């Protein structure tokens, strides 16, 4: 029988190898101004992101591998964020915009892409309603309030946000794989099956424009991730058992649970709280990704061709702007040999994927089937 010390050494080695192989990002080692966010240190942000998957963190602590994992994540963060900041700087220069410009200068830029970027930034910083782990959006109450911000500062914020939202959940997947290869069991984890592709697509097609009455439709905000979660549930992804089912309706901020329970005794307070007990992982773009990414293979890219090569009907695709968070979830579908997407808000059924590529600048695919 192998000793615990040998097991711990093997876990550390596997984690290191998997993380290094998984996260090499090309790019020059150029640092954007003020890479850290104004509210928390980078270390605190990473800790917060990891806390979203407490069972994995607890397992690493039990095996005395958590510090090694944190060190690897921190090292990867420096490389990844700087490379991403360099890429974003090149994107801006391709629009004829200097990174030293302010947000307000984008409004009158000659390139339409730069003017679109202005609108995207406003949506990110002013219209964003979800909690953020990087920025306190409440300080930005109008477009005018952000027009004096340096683009170089936003580049750093956006790169760090992407690392927290996208890369950290992916790193946790490799940590889980390493722990499981060494026989560590997670008795409270749900089963993570390969989902039923046909069931996902059939559900998406059936309710793309005719909403399922079993689920409440929000009167404000987006229904896109709520719709995707419904399709995944139809495809065989089990809801996490919750103690609040039927007794304490409301929206629970969590990425360790995934559920939507009707609860007739609810009092209307927000669109998602009325007659519903729901997790944010069911209804928020970022939280759904954080919930799924440690357990399913993912692809992240800004290259349309790379995205196309990784599409499959039934997969989840998420899109976002050049600067800012991912903001839309859809189900990949196919029609007449062309890749399409089916979604809510706006309601689309088998809309050509080229429109998705035109609307967004970066993409994530979750391979659930």
Regions found by a protein language model. Give the residues of each.
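Bacterial N-terminal signal peptides that target proteins for export
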Residues: 2-11
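...with weaker cross-activation on analogous glycine-rich loops/strands in unrelated enzymes
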Residues: 254-341
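Extended boundary segments
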Residues: 215-217, 226-280
């Amino acid at each position: 029988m192998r000793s615990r010390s040998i097991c711990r050494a093997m876990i550390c080695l596997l984690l290191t190898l998997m993380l290094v192989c998984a996260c090499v990002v090309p790019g020059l080692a150029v640092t954007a101004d003020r890479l850290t966010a104004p509210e928390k240190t980078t270390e605190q942000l990473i800790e917060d992101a990891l806390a979203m998957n407490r069972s994995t963190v607890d397992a690493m602590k039990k095996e005395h591998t958590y510090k090694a994992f944190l060190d690897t994540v921190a090292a990867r963060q420096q490389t990844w964020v700087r490379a991403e900041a360099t890429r974003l700087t090149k994107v801006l220069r391709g629009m004829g915009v200097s990174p030293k410009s302010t947000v307000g200068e984008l409004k009158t830029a000659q390139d339409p892409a730069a003017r679109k970027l202005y609108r995207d930034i406003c949506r990110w910083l002013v219209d964003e309603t979800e909690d953020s782990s990087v920025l306190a959006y409440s300080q930005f109450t109008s477009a005018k309030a952000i027009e004096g911000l340096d683009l170089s500062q936003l580049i750093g914020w956006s790169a760090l946000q992407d690392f927290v939202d996208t890369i950290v959940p992916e790193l946790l997947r490799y940590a889980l794989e390493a722990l499981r290869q060494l026989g560590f069991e997670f008795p409270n984890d749900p089963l993570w099956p390969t989902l039923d592709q046909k069931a996902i697509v059939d559900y998406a097609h059936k309710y793309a424009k005719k909403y399922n009455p079993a689920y409440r439709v929000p009167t404000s905000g987006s229904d896109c991730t709520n719709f995707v979660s419904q399709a995944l549930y139809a495809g065989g992804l089990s809801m996490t058992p919750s103690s609040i089912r039927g007794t304490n309706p409301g929206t629970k901020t969590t990425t360790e649970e995934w559920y939507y329970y009707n609860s007739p005794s609810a009092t209307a307070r927000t669109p998602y709280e009325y007659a519903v007990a729901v997790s944010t992982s069911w209804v928020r773009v970022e939280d759904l990704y954080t919930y799924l990414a440690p357990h399913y293979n993912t692809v992240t890219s800004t290259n349309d061709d790379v995205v196309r090569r990784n599409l499959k009907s039934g997969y989840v695709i998420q899109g976002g702007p050049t600067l800012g968070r991912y903001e839309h979830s859809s189900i990949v579908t196919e029609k007449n040999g062309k890749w399409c997407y089916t979604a809510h808000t706006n309601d689309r059924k088998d809309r050509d994927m080229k429109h998705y590529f035109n609307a967004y600048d970066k993409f994530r695919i979750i391979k659930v089937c």
